[in-house]
């Protein structure tokens, strides 16, 4: 009979995720599964991402992107999920405040202050309301705000879901600008912020380094400015 005081204890695995920014609001989360958020990317980029799931925050063309052509299981608000199913895309419908779990990945749909009409092939369809997501995988919690203005219930998102990383739009005009995003970062309370939705077009031109300096000068929050295609590793 073995020594009961000499039982082997397996090493504790740290939570781990890779986050790759693919430009605009498109982000790839890589862990035991791959989640592609707002797939506004070209076909070549789609080919190498090989996502297990796609998440769409709202119906605008710069967020719905290639969701139809990718045809991977897609998480979206009910109206968008219905539209995608009609296009042959396997879809999981949900709504604001709801949570679903798919093969070890948890999706919670959060509010966003933005419009959400589906824009495809020159026509518009009712796309429900815009949303954000808190996505939890492999012990890491990520908040993708989608397109949104600042709203005070971002504090609740922080209190309820404790995201490790917040991806916040900073482009202004159609979403928050840098000043509002700085306040949003404080509301959410994530230790790391990744700016998104900027510099795609002149109308949303911003300097992300100014945003980074402003936050890091006045808070303990870190900001990671990524180049398109660049990846950051998250451990907790």
Report residues per predicted region.
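Metallo-beta-lactamase
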Residues: 131-191, 196-203
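Active-site metal-binding motif and surrounding structural segment of the metallo-beta-lactamase
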Residues: 41-85, 90-92, 160-167
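A short acidic, amphipathic alpha-helical/loop segment
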Residues: 66-70, 83-87, 153-157, 180-184, ...
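Core dinuclear metal-dependent hydrolase active-site scaffold
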Residues: 2-49, 93-159, 228-236
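Binuclear metal-ion centers of metallo-dependent hydrolases, dominated by the metallo-beta-lactamase
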Residues: 20, 85-99, 182-236
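Active-site neighborhood of phospho(di)ester-bond hydrolases with catalytic His/Asp-centered motifs
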Residues: 36-38, 51-60, 74-77, 143-148, ...
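Active-site environment of divalent metal-dependent phosphoester hydrolases
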Residues: 43-45, 60-65, 81-84, 98-101, ...
């Amino acid at each position: 009979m073995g020594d009961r005081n000499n039982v082997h204890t397996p090493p504790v695995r740290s939570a781990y995720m890779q986050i790759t920014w693919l430009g605009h609001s498109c982000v790839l989360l890589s862990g035991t599964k791959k989640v592609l958020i707002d797939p506004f990317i070209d076909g070549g980029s789609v080919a190498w991402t090989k996502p297990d799931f796609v998440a769409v925050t709202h119906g605008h063309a710069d967020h719905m992107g290639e969701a139809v052509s990718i045809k991977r299981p897609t998480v979206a608000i009910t109206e968008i999920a219905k539209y995608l199913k009609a296009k042959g895309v396997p879809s999981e419908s949900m709504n604001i405040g709801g949570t679903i779990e798919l093969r070890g990945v948890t999706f919670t749909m959060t509010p966003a202050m933005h419009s959400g009409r589906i824009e495809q092939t020159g026509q518009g369809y009712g796309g429900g309301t815009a949303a954000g997501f808190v996505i939890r995988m492999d012990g890491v919690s990520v908040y993708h705000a989608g397109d949104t203005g600042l709203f005070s219930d971002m504090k609740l998102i922080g209190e309820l879901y404790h995201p490790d990383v917040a991806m916040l739009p900073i482009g202004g005009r159609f979403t928050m600008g840098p000043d509002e995003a700085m306040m949003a970062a404080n509301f959410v309370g994530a230790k790391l912020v990744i700016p998104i939705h900027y510099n795609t077009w002149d109308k949303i031109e911003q300097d992300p380094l100014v945003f980074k300096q402003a936050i890091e000068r006045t808070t303990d929050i870190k900001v990671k400015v990524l180049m398109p295609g660049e990846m950051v590793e998250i451990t907790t």
